[in-house]
Regions:
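Intrinsically disordered, low-complexity terminal regulatory regions
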Residues: 2-60
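Heme-based O2/NO sensor domains and their adjacent alpha-helical segments
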Residues: 25, 50-132
Length: 132
């Protein structure tokens, strides 16, 4: 497991979404074993380019005030430490999406990520004071 602060893959609480529901969702969006195969191939291409992908994404977020707002401190300015902490986990998420099996551990962590994007758990992982 990657040594990234706040990266809790494999130890996240159980997702309320069941594996059966995940399989039904995959069917509904036509996600197949072939998609998984190509994600693994993409992961091989991306593994040495993660920083470039993150630079592009952070440039996009940073160019939209309504997006960077969610990384702002009480002073209204982007919190560089918060952005850096999230960046490390986002890079690992890209690799996980490409290489990890879509099993219960994966599902649990995706649910955890969702909670961290909602006022339920936003700001807690990095102990920051940002907008909910």
């Amino acid at each position: 497991m990657a040594n990234i602060p706040g990266y809790t893959y494999g130890s996240a609480a159980p997702s309320p979404v069941t594996m059966r529901e995940l399989e039904e969702l995959k069917q509904a969006v036509l996600f197949t074993a072939e998609d998984e195969k190509y994600l693994k191939m993409a992961g091989e291409v991306l593994k040495d380019q993660i920083e470039e992908v993150l630079d592009l994404w952070y440039g996009f977020v940073g160019s939209h005030p309504h997006l960077v707002y969610y990384f702002s401190g009480p002073d209204g300015k982007p919190d560089a430490n918060y952005l850096a902490a999230v960046r490390k986990r986002f890079g690992q998420w890209i690799l996980d999406t490409c290489h990890r099996p879509y099993d219960q551990a994966w599902l649990n962590y995706q649910h955890e990520i969702g909670l961290r994007h909602h006022r339920t758990k936003k700001n807690q992982t990095d102990r920051v004071q940002s907008v909910p």
